[in-house]
Amino acid sequence: MLALEGLHKTFRLGGGWERPALRGVDLVLQEGEFATLIGPNGAGKSTLLNAVAGTFRVDAGTVRLDGQDVTRWPEHRRARLIGRVFQDPLRGTAASLTVEENLAMARARGRRRSLRLAVRGRERRLFAEWLEALGLGLADRLKQPVGLLSGGQRQALALVMAAVTRPRLLLLDEHTAALDPAASRQVLDLTCRLVAEHGLTVLMVTHNMEQALRVGSRTLMMQDGRVVLDLRGDDRRRMGVEGLVERFARVRGQRLVEDRLLLG
Ligand SMILES: Nc1ncnc2c1ncn2[C@@H]1O[C@H](COP(=O)(O)OP(=O)(O)OP(=O)(O)O)[C@@H](O)[C@H]1O
């Protein structure tokens, strides 16, 4: 479904400074796989998601989606195949538009038609049904501007908008991290429900070890621009949070030692 081969990306910061962020990432996600991605700060997790989404061109390597080489496709073209939810609830929805207008916008995107925000009766009933099923109190607020919603409600809406277009791949970049614990749990439950209902293929960045092991079917760990751990099946089931924390501390410790060597 998603196949990454030899991805490299170095950010050039001016004054001759360079920051390598991806140093040869190889990764295959099968259709319907739900992988979580952890790693210390600066490991390259968001850069990897950006490379897949086409936010920038990679320096080397290929990105394949459904067997198509999309490496040179611009972001907007890849967006027809890829849904994405960010950490910031403000990024996935348009604050000045109503809940139903946001949903209409998402549906129009999924159908590859021009944007049409006028919502008719049948469509409104369909939206109400979707939101009713979430049980987050959104169904009665179809005509309210999204700017009036709580962060959790807004993130739930962003998730529904990303899922209803039936993307071939869903990228979740710490999408529950900015929410309070109750909202975070609700949005994570909703994520699992939507993923199961639509049979989505998912790559989800998280800093929560428990989530990284218990949510989805595969756990990846990055360090210094590479995937350094890939757990699934029995290995994953046997791995406890403590074991993962220990592996994480080890890669982070190594990073600190390397940084000290560099600074020294
Ligand atoms: N636009 C950019 N310009 C310059 N450097 C960047 C840019 N984006 C990322 N980097 C650098 O690339 C490296 C990887 O960053 P990235 O944001 O992908 O890490 P991350 O694993 O997502 O970290 P975090 O968990 O803190 O979000 C870091 O050294 C970061 O400073």
Spans of features found by a protein language model:
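ABC ATPase nucleotide-binding domains
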Residues: 236-264
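ABC ATPase C-loop
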Residues: 162-163
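A short, flexible loop at the N-terminus of ABC-type nucleotide-binding domains that lies
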Residues: 1, 10-24, 74
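The feature captures the beta-strand-to-loop junction immediately N-terminal to the Walker
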Residues: 38-40
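ABC ATPase NBD coupling module
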Residues: 15, 19, 57, 69-83, ...
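H-loop/switch region of ABC-family ATPase nucleotide-binding domains
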Residues: 206-207
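Helix-to-loop junction immediately C-terminal to a conserved catalytic motif
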Residues: 53
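Conserved ABC transporter NBD signature motif
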Residues: 61-68, 229-231
